[in-house]
Every structure is written in C-alpha cells, then in structure tokens.
Amino acid sequence: MSKFSFNINHQYKKARSGIITTAHGNIRTPAFMPVGTRGTVKAMLPESVAETGADILLGNTYHLMLQPSAERIAKLGGLHKFMNWGKPILTDSGGFQVMSLSKLRKITEEGVSFNSHINGDKYLLTPERSTEIQHLLGSTITMAFDECTPYPATFEEAKTSMQLTTRWAHRSREAFVKRDGYAQFGIIQGSTYEELREQSAKDLIELDFEGYAIGGLAVGEGQELMFKVLDYAPDFLPQNKPRYLMGVGKPADIIGAVSRGVDMFDCVIPTRSGRNGQAFTKYGTVNIRNSKYAEDNDPLEADCLCPACQNYSKAYLHHLVRIGEILGAMLMTWHNLTYFQNLMSRIREYIALGKDFDFTT
C-alpha cells in the first residue's frame, strides 16, 4: 500500500500544483472536493461524480454518526464500500456542524454535548470519539476535532477558542490510528488575528500532522478580510504538506486562495446552486429559472462536456427546473461539478505554465 505523501510538481509565486498519494488513489492539487454530507453527493451517482473529474469527496461525521451510525457503516465494510466510491474520502470532524447547533449544544473541556436535530437524543462528541468515528468510516483523511471560532470574535474570545482547539488537537492526534496511505489533518484557528493564527500553526506543527487545514473562515467575514488572513496564514504552515481551506468554494475565492498557497477546497455551492437552478460558467452564473431562457436552444456552455451541455438546451433545463423535476437538479448539479473540476484543471495548467489565471479561457 502506498504511503501518504504530497509532492509539489510546479510552483508559480505562492500557488502550487502537485499530487497527494493515498491508500485510495492520487489527488491532483489544487483540488476541489464535492460534499457528500450523508454518504451521497446530492442528485449524483458516485460514478457520475468521478466522471466530472473529482479525485476526492467529503463526508460528514456529524450526519453519518446520527444516521445510519459509524458502527453500522463499519459493519457493512466502511464508507467507501457503503457508497461505492473507490477514491479518497475526507471526513470533517463534526465540529462545525455541532457548533452551529447553538442552543442544542454545550462546550466543555471534554468535548461538545448536544441533542440530535433529528430526534432529540443526547450525544457527547469528543476528540477521541470524533477520531474513532472517522476510523470506523474508513476515512482516507481524518480531520482533528476543533472548535470553529464564530465571527466576529474579540481577541480574547478567539484566543480562548484557539487554545481549546490546540488541546483537542493533541487528543485527536493521540487517538488517531496511523496506517500507510491514511492521514490526519490538524486545523488552525485564530479568527482574523495574525498573532493567534501563527501561534495555532506553531502548536499544531509540533504534532506533525500529515496535512493542515485553515478553519474559521468563510463564516461571514467577507472576501476582503478572508484574503487578508490568507495573505499570511498559509505561510505559517509547512511547505511540504497539503493546505486545506475549509468550506470555501466560490470560484473567485478559490483562485484567490490558490494564489496565496492553498491546495484543497470543499463547498456545497456547486451542488446546492445546481438544485436551486443556478449554473456556473466561465462567463458568470446563469439563473436558468429566468424566463429569457424559455426558448433558448443553446447549451449552458458550448465547450462543456457534461451531459447537460452535450445533450440538452437551456430551454429544456429551464422547463425542468421551473416544474421541479428531479432530472433538472441532476443535470444542473452535474454541470456545476464539471465546471468546478474544469476550473481546478485549468488552475493546475496555469500554475504549470507560470501564468496568472484567466477565468474565460
């Protein structure tokens, strides 16, 4: 079995392109991970997700621990077998979802106690339990348990939260079962404070994670402030390990983050937007519900190879979405995921050529 490794093949300014080698295959970076929250990328077959060019997808610890349970998935052979996906899977730690429960959860040094949003049952999610769940799922890349610092946060609030994340990172690392081809990423926090981001990175580097994520962004701070943090945060992380910006997926945000040294991304934007009738193209977004597309015989994008563009007109997609047909959500999602994977492919090409990225080529 291959060992987990990251090799940078090309670098242009701060942007890097390379290959992550894992037990479940290679990941070309910069990489975009479609979100498969409950063991499925909504409105897509796993083989269709692979056809879009995706090398890896994301699963959600919080949702899978509730339904059908990590133990059941393990009994059935692990998440890869369960959902028929042979490529790498990264699972988040569940921390972000639990923190977003607000009134339903309580944070202590031990972990987070919360009530299920499904039936009200009480759970305790700790660094050890989160790591165990991800092991039971068979995750290729496990995320350390963290507290996602809310925005805005004062310096003291962000410091207290960051220090808790550091202590939880130690416990997550101790609980992680090391195996060839598998990895665990630590998550740096610190809100929008450079001093805290630097300290968080220093603390986590001591634990020698296989990769590092930048958490606590895309939580309402806006692109300008996010880029300001990304001007320095990736530089605090090891050059020879993958850097993952969690929850970021607007094309302009991805391009800006890649140019600042980020390698991996995930976001629900392409799938959620597709289900809501919004398509991404090189020339901007298309709201297919708009009546101006009712008699438009052209495809969404003439040079796109996805089934929606190769076989159907904007008029047909407009019709499907307006009447709420499931096929509309499927085709729009397929197109958006194809667009995002094509975007990542073009970004990798531009890095290899040593050129600044152009959206429209």
Swiss-Prot record:
SUPFAM superfamilies: tRNA-guanine transglycosylase. Binds 1 zinc ion per subunit. It catalyses: 7-aminomethyl-7-carbaguanine + guanosine(34) in tRNA = 7-aminomethyl-7-carbaguanosine(34) in tRNA + guanine. Zn(2+) binds at C304, C306, C309, H335. The active site is at D92 (proton acceptor), D266 (nucleophile). It is an enzyme of class 2 (transferase). This is Queuine tRNA-ribosyltransferase. The gene is tgt.
